């Protein structure tokens, strides 16, 4: 494991959230936000309304900027995010995780918790200087983000669909050149 479990989950959640904005947008309803929330084991306050959905959707470009920034820019963004949220890191334990960090109260708005948890995860990325683990999908027609947690740093595509599309295109190109 490259990072602690909570860091990896926070990064995976942030990448999934950012990628939900790629066409077709997959975060257009409160039900879809509920699915995202459950998929990444978020806990705490949920308003479950359109205002919460709109706030989370508006966060996507902010997180994209953070996750695609260089090291020095990331530090500035992380510090601003944590200061704006009044973050105070504390160790907590709740199901399904053992001891891990939360930096805002569980009753903070979901958008604040997402922002702060992503910023806290990026602290580990900055400290380990592992920015090569974050990138943009190698598919020319896709702008999705890639989080590469593989041991050999081999992940190039944001999804299986993008990887398969490129494998098929490469196969067809090879077959076409044989004729």
Segments predicted by a language model, with ranges:
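Glycine-rich loops and low-complexity Gly/Arg-rich segments
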Residues: 116, 126-127, 161-163, 171-172
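Short helix-coil boundary/hinge micro-motifs
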Residues: 1-148
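Contiguous alpha-helical segments
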Residues: 172-179
């Amino acid at each position: 494991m490259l990072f602690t479990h909570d860091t990896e989950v926070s990064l995976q959640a942030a990448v999934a959230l950012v990628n939900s904005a790629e066409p077709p947008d997959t975060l257009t309803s409160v039900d879809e936000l509920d699915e995202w929330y459950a998929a990444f084991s978020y806990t705490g306050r949920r308003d479950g309304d359109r205002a919460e959905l709109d706030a989370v959707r508006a966060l996507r470009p902010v997180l994209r900027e953070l996750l695609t920034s260089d090291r020095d820019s990331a530090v500035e963004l992380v510090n601003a995010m944590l200061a704006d949220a009044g973050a105070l890191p504390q160790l907590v334990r709740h199901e399904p995780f053992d001891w891990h960090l939360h930096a805002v109260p569980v009753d903070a708005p979901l958008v604040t918790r997402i922002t702060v948890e992503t910023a806290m995860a990026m602290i580990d990325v900055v400290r380990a200087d592992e920015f090569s683990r974050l990138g943009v999908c190698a598919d020319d027609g896709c702008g999705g983000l890639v989080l590469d947690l593989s041991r050999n740093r081999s992940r190039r595509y944001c999804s299986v669909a993008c990887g398969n599309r490129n494998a098929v295109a490469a196969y067809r190109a090879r077959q076409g050149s044989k004729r």
